[in-house]
Amino acid sequence: MALPTHAPLGSLRSQMQLTLHTHHAIRLWHGRLPSGHLHGILGLNGFVAQVNRIHRDAAQDDPYADAWLLRIEAKLDTARAELLDLRAQLSDALTQAPAALQLGDNLNLAPVQLPVTVNAPLGFLALYLLADYDELARRALLAQHTALIDPPTLERWLEDGAHVLRSLFSLVQTYRTSGVCRNDIAAGNAKALHAREQFGELPQPILDGSQRARHAPPLRRPGPNGQGNAAPVPNATEVLDKATTEPVPPCTP
């Protein structure tokens, strides 16, 4: 039986969960709610929610959201490098065990399995870093248990790794949606002026779309029928070649 060429299809979905073995990693997942004189600490869960929001805003052609994705991407690269350095130090310590002693995986008998809902690639990259930290914590606890490192070294490595992730997660706490798109900026309308007053000026490569994060989403721009369509950002030369004196259309119909 022949299938119709344009058979209706639903959205693709997959079920994902993250398995954590240490309290150190679980605390970084949840973060901390503000209480009394203690300020709140954003965990991975809150970080992912903010990154999903920024990713969605960037897809709507918001140049300020694109600037945030670049900042987050740079911070992720730095965090990854710092965790790799800690992992290298730990690996050196574990090699001090005699060849006759086989050290197996240090796994929790009842690990925590957390459902994962991530809609942005940068959220996944942060999740991978938390999984790496969980492994680092497990192996460091094993190294201390087998006298390959002392307790102060264990605490220092655990805290250094946790600080790297907390610094990453806290980066997005101040994000606010600007409510503008590149057409607003080009038109110099009231929305653009308000955004500039609140969030400042942006570098030209971000404004013209030539500088975007590696995992930036395709842009959705209003089509002739008022519906958002994915469209590449033109480069600066194309913009100059097609310049006209017509008014720039707004972002939304």
Label every model-predicted segment.
Residues 148-149:
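Conserved hydrophobic residue
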Residues 152-153:
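Short, solvent-exposed positions on alpha-helices
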Residues 1-128, 135, 142, 161-253:
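Polar/charged low-complexity regulatory segments
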Residues 139-140, 157:
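Short, hydrophobic/aromatic alpha-helical segments in well-folded domains
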